[in-house]
Amino acid sequence: MFYWLIELTNTFPSLSVFRGVLNVFRYITFRTGGAVVTGALFVFLFGPWIIDHLRLRQGKGQPIRTDGPQSHIISKKGTPTMGGLMILSGLVVSTVLWANPLNPYVWIVLAVTLGFGFVGFYDDYLKVTKQSHSGFAGRARLLIEAAIALVACYALVRLGRDPSSTGLAIPFFKDLVIKFGWMYVIFGAFVIVGAGNAVNLTDGLDGLAIVPVMIASASFGLIAYLAGNAVFSDYLQIHYVAGTGELAVLCGAVLGAGLGFLWFNAPPASIFMGDTGSLALGGMLGSIAVAVKHEIVLAVIGGLFVLEAVSVIVQVASFKLTGKRIFRMAPIHHHFEQLGWTEPQIVIRFWIISVMLALVGLSTLKLR
């Protein structure tokens, strides 16, 4: 919306005196900064009201796993969930205000984010109303997520309009691209669905998921800005995708809304993100990675999410095949709890890992 302010000076000559000041709204970097501040302020201001409303409507709050760490039954009992509504509200408001409303990439990523958020919201709703961990049926949920992701990937491929839009770039190599053709739509959907569920599995401790999400968002905000700039992408020899620079504004909105949410999610949490937030944010990261052609880099920067997801897959596969469990409990953050690590130790150490992985992922932009 603010992007159009500069157009007012062209439409109304009497406003041309403000052209110098309003010209800053042309710059993605300025609008990204504005999106960060707006997203954070929105959640800061409306967060307490949303939390009170959710606590009143949910009563007992999110059901706590009885087979998990016993400390959670006491410390987390009665805490409301669906905190992702705070993040999504701040994200949408900030993006609408600061992003170019004519950019199709922004709307595609927003559609995936809200679509996954709706699936997560329904899952949270079922869990809260039934006071059970069996929410939305797993297969049905995955089918809906896959449908959303397939439509989004098809739209992204159509926007690309060149052979490289259906290829997979390999980090550290200048011209190595695996060509999928139209099968890339399926691969891209797998990336989006996988990212959504990986972040969902990570969200198990206060503050554990939101900070790595913010780190990944900041990293992909930079990648989107560079990939959407012809000069920078040519210098770094990365795939140029015209128009994706605007996704940096959306990433800024996520960063700001995430900061606001962390204020209330810091231990002891006043609210949980829930599937509403974790699925939405994971789907967002996956769709941005597909849009800017850095799918493998997402697996590096979001390596913590991959670790959490793999720990669950390995645990389930091992138990079904051998009857034995590899970890004391999965996802892996609960394994460390069982080993005696405190919740703050796990959360902060995982944050540190996320920062290190982000630096490694960003280094792939130059090391080719």
Swiss-Prot record:
Keywords: Cell cycle, Cell division, Cell inner membrane, Cell membrane, Cell shape, Cell wall biogenesis/degradation, Magnesium, Membrane, Metal-binding, Peptidoglycan synthesis, Transferase, Transmembrane, Transmembrane helix
Catalyses which reaction(s): UDP-N-acetyl-alpha-D-muramoyl-L-alanyl-gamma-D-glutamyl-meso-2,6-diaminopimeloyl-D-alanyl-D-alanine + di-trans,octa-cis-undecaprenyl phosphate = di-trans,octa-cis-undecaprenyl diphospho-N-acetyl-alpha-D-muramoyl-L-alanyl-D-glutamyl-meso-2,6-diaminopimeloyl-D-alanyl-D-alanine + UMP
EC number: 2.7.8.13
Biological processes, Gene Ontology terms: cell division; cell wall organization; peptidoglycan biosynthetic process; regulation of cell shape
InterPro entries: Glycosyl_transferase_4, PNAcMuramoyl-5peptid_Trfase, PNAcMuramoyl-5peptid_Trfase_CS
Residues that span the membrane, as ranges: 34-54, 79-99, 102-122, 140-160, 176-196, 207-227, 247-267, 271-291, 296-316, 345-365
One cellular-component annotation, GO: plasma membrane
Record-linked PROSITE patterns: MRAY_1, MRAY_2
Entry cofactors: Mg(2+)
Main location: membrane
An annotated Gene Ontology molecular function: phospho-N-acetylmuramoyl-pentapeptide-transferase activity
Keyword Membrane: yes
Subcellular location: Cell inner membrane
Membrane topology: Multi-pass membrane protein
Pathway connected to this protein: Cell wall biogenesis; peptidoglycan biosynthesis
Keyword Cell division belongs to the record: yes
Superkingdom field: Bacteria
EC main group: transferase
Reported function: Catalyzes the initial step of the lipid cycle reactions in the biosynthesis of the cell wall peptidoglycan: transfers peptidoglycan precursor phospho-MurNAc-pentapeptide from UDP-MurNAc-pentapeptide onto the lipid carrier undecaprenyl phosphate, yielding undecaprenyl-pyrophosphoryl-MurNAc-pentapeptide, known as lipid I.
HAMAP family: MraY
NCBIfam families, per the entry: mraY
Protein family membership: Belongs to the glycosyltransferase 4 family. MraY subfamily.
Protein name per Swiss-Prot or TrEMBL: Phospho-N-acetylmuramoyl-pentapeptide-transferase
Gene name as annotated: mraY
